[in-house]
Amino acid sequence: MKALFLIFHGFEEANGISKKIRYQVKALKECGMDVHTCYLNEENGHKCRMIDNHTLRDYGSGIKGKLRKRFELQSIVKYILQENIQLVYMRSYHNANPFTISMVKQLKRQGVKVVMEIPTYPYDQEYITRRMKLDLLVDRCF
């Protein structure tokens, strides 16, 4: 079975979440799945959506790059359908918004199974800045 492990951020080698994701991908592969990883790469303010180590979509830099990385998800849908991906495993990262919901609906209409991992720890108290609280508010709305 072909699967896509979809995350909405990049990898940091010293980060525990990044290590967990890499172990999850490894475990899925050991179970016989053909797993590809979709993630964001941001170097020097330049943003790209990656599949494994290949650029799926170059969003550029600046405000346009920041907006595109959040709202442009059609490249992911196109890749999934072209590659006949049967399962998408998404890791939630404050990305509950109309664009993500629309992407999931499109995939489900095409028969793609979608699983979303949602962190269960009480993270609300960890958000102290206005920007963090805004992310949390949007996440709660959708």
Kindly give the residue locations of the regions a language model identified:
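Short aromatic-enriched loop/helix-cap "lid" or pocket-rim segments at secondary-structure transitions
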Residues: G16-S18, K47-I51, T100-S102, E126-R130
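Hydrophobic/aromatic beta-strand patches that form the interior of the parallel beta-sheet core
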Residues: H36-C38, R57, V115
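Short N-terminal targeting/anchoring amphipathic segment
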Residues: V77-P98, V112-V115
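Membrane-proximal helix-turn-helix segments that form the acceptor-binding/catalytic region
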Residues: K26, Q74, P98, S102-Q110, ...
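Residue-level recognition of beta-strand->loop/alpha-helix junctions
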Residues: Y39-N41, G60, P122
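Histidine-centered beta-alpha loop that forms part of the nucleotide-sugar donor binding/catalytic region
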Residues: F8, S92-Y93, E117-P122
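A short, charged, and often flexible helix/loop element on the N-terminal side
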Residues: N44-K78, M90-S92, T129-L134
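N-terminal subdomain of nucleotide-sugar transferases
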Residues: M1-N44, Q82-E83, Q110
